[in-house]
Amino acid sequence: KAIRRQRQMCIRDRITYFYTLIDDAVARVMKSEGGYIWACKNYDGDVMSDMVSSAFGSLAMMTSVLVTPDGKYEYEAAHGTVQRHYYKHLKGEETSTNSVATIFAWTGALRKRGELDGSHELEEFADKLEKACVKTIEDGKMTKDLALITTIPNPVVLNSEDFIKAIRSTLEGMLLL
C-alpha cells in the first residue's frame, strides 16, 4: 500500500519511479555515475549510505539530515560514534579520528538556525567553517583515514586534536578576511 502511494505521488510530480529490492539497488548504485535521487526507508538508507561512503572514501566524510513531515530538522554525522577510537582515548592512546562529518552536522544545524532566525552572519559562519575543513584537507593536513586514500602528495597525518586545531587555524584566517 505504501509503495503504491509513493508511486502515485511520483507519477503526479513527474518523477520517474521504480521499486527494486535492496540487492539490486546496491548493484545499481555501485555501477552508477549518479544523477538521481535515491529514496530509502530508514534502515535501508542507513546501511546503503554507509556502504557507498566507505566504498568511495571515508564514512567520516558523510553527514545525515533527518526531516520530519512537519518540517523539523536533525543534523548528525552519518557514522554515529566511533566506539573503538573512544576506547583508545579512554586508555590515553592517541587517535586520528576524522571529525569532518561531525563538524558538518553542526554547521548544517547552525545554517538552518540562521535561516530560521534570519541571521545571515550565522549562515556565513557555517559556510566558512565548512570551507575551512575542505581547505585544511586540500592543503594536505588530514586524519589517517583520508591520508590512506588521498592523491595529494605527502599528506601530513594528524591526530584528532591536531586536525581540529588545523581547521581552527584555517577558519581564523578566513574570519579575518
Regions of interest found by a model, annotated:
Residues 1-7, 11:
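Single conserved hydrophobic/aromatic residue that forms the stacking wall/gate
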Residues 12-35:
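A structured beta-alpha segment of the ubiquitous adenosine-cofactor-binding alpha/beta core
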Residues 14, 23-24, 50, 131, ...:
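Sparse, context-dependent recognition of short Cys/His-centered cofactor- or disulfide-binding micro-motifs
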Residues 29-128, 135-136:
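Glycine-rich phosphate/nucleotide-binding loop
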Residues 91-97, 112-177:
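Internal helix-turn-beta structural module
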